[in-house]
From Swiss-Prot:
InterPro entries: ADF-H (IPR002108), ADF-H/Gelsolin-like_dom_sf (IPR029006), ADF/Cofilin (IPR017904)
GO biological-process terms attached to the record: actin filament depolymerization
Keywords: Actin-binding
Domain ADF-H span(s) in chain numbering: 15-149
Protein's UniProt name: Actin-depolymerizing factor 10
Coiled-coil stretches: none
GO CC term (a single one): cytoplasm
Highest taxon in the source lineage: Eukaryota
Gene3D superfamilies recorded: Severin (3.40.20.10)
Length: 151
């Protein structure tokens, strides 16, 4: 299969998946289990072969720090660990998978990220919510809080 001049084929004509290295999976597990990171930002490497960790945020970093770390003109995947107080006044934590595909990013990048999103998301067991964002308003902190409070 060819997508915008990029051939996506494996042996026997099956789709070739972009690899998720152990280091990328470990960064997610460190966020989920050990609370070492507040967020992890992933990108598809320049060879379009692997989904790699681009940046991690320390537990004390804010949501604004996270959103400022996303490029304004290129796609990324991210996981964010949202701590919040629920409507019934309980402290909770929910993990969000965010597919960031700004409207100004290249069509080729949008396509490659869209094609590999489900495969990557499947590797991250324990994500509570998924958000697909093309604009900062799509992933405003209040949007996340609203989704988290509905559970």
């Amino acid at each position: 299969m060819e997508i915008l001049g990029f051939t996506v084929m494996g042996g026997g004509g099956s789709p070739a998946w972009i690899e998720v290295p152990e280091k990328s999976k470990s960064a997610f597990w460190e966020l989920k289990r050990r609370k070492v990171h507040r967020y992890v930002i992933f990108k598809i490497d320049d060879r379009r072969e692997e989904i790699v960790v681009e940046k991690t945020g320390a537990p004390g970093e804010s949501y604004d720090d996270f959103t400022a770390s996303l490029p304004a003109d290129d796609c990324r995947y991210a996981v964010y660990d949202l701590d919040f107080v629920s409507d019934d006044n309980c402290r909770k934590s929910k993990i969000f998978f965010i597919s960031w595909s700004p409207s100004v990013s290249r069509i080729r990048a949008k396509t490659i990220y869209a094609v590999s999103r489900n495969q990557f998301r499947h590797e991250l067991d324990g994500v509570h919510f998924e958000i697909q964002a093309t604009d900062p308003d799509d992933m405003d902190l209040e949007v996340l809080r609203g989704r988290a409070n509905r559970t």
